[in-house]
From Swiss-Prot:
Organism this protein belongs to: Oryza sativa subsp. japonica
EC number: 2.7.4.3
UniProtKB keywords: ATP-binding, Chloroplast, Kinase, Nucleotide-binding, Plastid, Transferase, Transit peptide
Enzymatic reactions: AMP + ATP = 2 ADP
Protein name: Probable adenylate kinase 2, chloroplastic
SUPFAM superfamilies (UniProt xref): P-loop containing nucleoside triphosphate hydrolases (SSF52540)
Biased composition (Low complexity): 1-10
UniProt subcellular location: Plastid, Chloroplast
Annotated segments matching region Disordered: 1-37
One GO term of the biological process aspect: energy homeostasis
Family to which this protein belongs: Belongs to the adenylate kinase family.
């Protein structure tokens, strides 16, 4: 019987001299950290592992994150005298670069038609035969430039600002172009372009006696000249245009680019395209080097 008990004792697993969890006052007290470490070491030796030679587990390296930084879209202002071809060039710029084309005049008419707060205020002045205050127009322009499409695609501000006070108001709002395109056309050519224009009252189409004459005699017989397309009126408008440009030079002199507008349409756009591409490249380089 004794030998049987001895054999049984020999087969029993060794008892580790470790602290057992105790309960005091209803609280569970785990073994001390030193005792827990002792248990782990004993377990490792039983499995034939030497703690001294055990390789530490290597931590994964931090993944390298590459973020592609994109330059802000182009912000362009364009100005030109009456009949300088500005409208045609705006369409070409918009088509190639996808910029949001914003004309202050069109914007004003749209706001009035929509009955917006700015439109209602502007209409009150126009009905009295007064100029719409800069404050109202600047606010319209600002709100349009802050729309998501203009922020995402970039913008092309057509014929605005026209005065020093308007430009300063935009500067105060931190609205500034990357490039200001100024179309330069000789006065005699501008006068010729304006004075030769004719309106078809039936279709609303604009013709030019020299550059785009009517298709037939029937159309030619009904063409009329608009009241402000006379030589006297156009010269007054040119004088106002040059005064406006002069007032803007001090603000935008570092971004103004003069483009000769007396060449063929495609040649004029080729020069504008070159300037816009250069401006976009500079923006990209600045972002890459930041």
């Amino acid at each position: 019987m004794a030998s049987s008990m001895a054999a049984t004792a020999t087969l029993s697993p060794p008892v580790l001299s470790a602290e057992r969890p105790t309960v005091r006052g209803g609280l569970f007290l785990p073994p001390s950290p030193a005792t827990s470490r002792s248990l782990r070491l004993q377990s490792a030796r039983r499995c034939g592992i030497s703690p001294a030679t055990r390789k530490p587990r290597s931590l994964p390296r931090a993944a390298k994150v590459v973020v592609a930084v994109k330059a802000d879209p182009l912000k362009v202002m364009i100005a030109g005298a009456p009949a300088s071809g500005k409208g045609t060039q705006c369409e070409l710029i918009k088509s190639k670069y996808g910029l949001v084309h914003i004309s202050a005049g069109d914007l004003l008419r749209a706001e009035i038609a929509a009955g917006s707060e700015n439109g209602k205020r502007a209409k009150e002045f126009m009905e009295k035969g007064q100029l719409v205050p800069d404050e109202i127009v600047v606010n319209m322009v600002k709100e349009r430039l802050l729309q998501p499409d203009a922020q995402e695609k970039g913008w092309l501000l057509d014929g605005y600002p026209r005065s020093y006070s308007q430009a300063m108001a935009l500067e105060t709002l931190n609205i500034r172009p990357d490039i200001f395109i100024l179309l330069d056309v000789p006065d005699e050519l501008l006068v010729e372009r304006v004075v030769g224009r004719r309106l078809d009252p039936v279709t609303g189409k604009i013709y030019h006696l020299k550059y785009s004459p009517p298709e037939n005699e029937e159309i030619a017989s009904r063409l009329t000249q608009r009241f402000d397309d006379t030589e006297e009126k156009v010269k007054l408008r040119l004088q106002t245009h040059y005064q406006n440009v002069e007032s803007l030079l001090s603000i935008y002199e570092d971004v103004i680019v003069e483009v000769k507008g007396d060449a063929l349409v495609d040649d004029v756009f080729a020069e504008i395209d070159k300037q816009l591409t250069s401006s976009l490249d500079k923006k990209t380089e600045m972002v890459a080097s930041a």
